[in-house]
């Protein structure tokens, strides 16, 4: 994710991960991607006394009531293992409908970005890509749920699409287009 963010930001902006600054992440107890993005942005801004941009993103599957949603990483357990998370998605889909692989399962990948300076919210935006869940994981590119997400208008998963092509159509790119004017 950090590499993708670096690619999308202007080169004059320095990017640091929380671990590079030896900071633990805050508890993400918001109810939406936007809430969690703001929680992280405010938290890190207060820690380093600089404006901070934070991302919160995940997968929403309609038939699962928009789950995993804000819990997307947590579906992979404590280590956020997305192979586990993908297996859980398939398990949950099988519980809902044994025949789901023969249908189009509507889903979207969402990215919320926020910029905060201390307690002040400078900007908060959202980007999303609509699509469907692939009956089986495909591709080695990207990360997270990329191997099981097929964007509308494509026949391939994000995991099969080249990074350069994906960056031009994905949820994070759409969110960055909206937030660029605040950078």
Explain the meaning of each model-derived region.
Residues 1-183:
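Anionic-ligand binding patches
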